[in-house]
């Protein structure tokens, strides 16, 4: 039986408990092929007994002895700390890097008093781990000269902008749910990469 995984996440196999039985959670995860009590047995096959249906007159309950696969979709990408832009020179350097390397950069325009901005920053650092060729920066609008803020044409926060070839290309204004913002940022990067 083929097993299709949408991403490099961890799969583990475990035996389904008998009806009404409590089973403690597994201590560790393992891949389908190795480890755990299900090593070497194919997924979705009966694990007990010989052929057909067990003994005469006995009926197997659904899930009894069945091997089940569970996927754990936690994020395995390592967060990358975003670099701070605190002057016009650093902004120009970041844009120059984008032009020289023909790669987009992401700039998170935020403020220290903005709760949504603070909440999104570690999530953006996780996304930075997913896109190794793209550099991620942040600008605290209260700590930089107004010329930097005007250059980004910032009116709302958090604003996450994608710059490519030294020019503004796209932006996401993060006033809605964090997971939606992160999905929009991923789409924006994939579109302009």
Curated annotation (Swiss-Prot):
Disulfide bonds: 114-117
All copies of domain Thioredoxin, residue ranges: 17-193
One cellular component (GO) term of this entry: chloroplast stroma
Record keywords: Disulfide bond, Electron transport, Redox-active center, Transport
Family annotation (Pfam families): Thioredoxin (PF00085)
Keyword match Transport: yes
Catalytic residues in the record: 114, 117
PANTHER family noted in UniProt: THIOREDOXIN-LIKE 3-1, CHLOROPLASTIC, THIOREDOXIN-LIKE 3-2, CHLOROPLASTIC
Protein family (similarity comment): Belongs to the thioredoxin family.
Biological function: Probable thiol-disulfide oxidoreductase that may participate in various redox reactions.
Protein name according to UniProt: Thioredoxin-like 3-1, chloroplastic
Species this protein is from: Oryza sativa subsp. japonica (Rice)
């Amino acid at each position: 039986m083929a097993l299709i995984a949408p991403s490099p996440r961890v799969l583990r196999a475990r035996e389904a408990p008998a009806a009404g039985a409590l089973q403690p959670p597994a201590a560790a995860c393992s891949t389908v092929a190795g480890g755990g009590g299900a090593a070497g047995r194919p997924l979705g096959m009966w694990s007990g007994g010989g052929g057909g249906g067990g003994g005469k007159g006995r009926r197997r309950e659904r899930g009894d002895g069945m091997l089940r696969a569970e996927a754990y979709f936690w994020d395995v990408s390592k967060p990358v700390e975003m670099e701070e832009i605190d002057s016009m020179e650093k902004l120009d350097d970041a844009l120059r890097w984008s032009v020289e390397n023909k790669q987009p950069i992401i700039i998170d325009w935020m403020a220290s008093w903005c709760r949504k901005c603070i909440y999104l920053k570690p999530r953006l650092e996780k996304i930075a781990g997913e896109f190794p060729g793209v550099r991620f920066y942040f600008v605290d609008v209260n700590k930089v000269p107004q010329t930097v803020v005007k250059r980004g044409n910032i009116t709302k926060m958090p604003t996450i902008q994608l710059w490519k070839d030294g020019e503004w290309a796209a932006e996401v204004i993060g006033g809605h749910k964090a997971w939606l913002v992160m999905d929009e940022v991923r789409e924006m990067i994939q579109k302009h990469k």
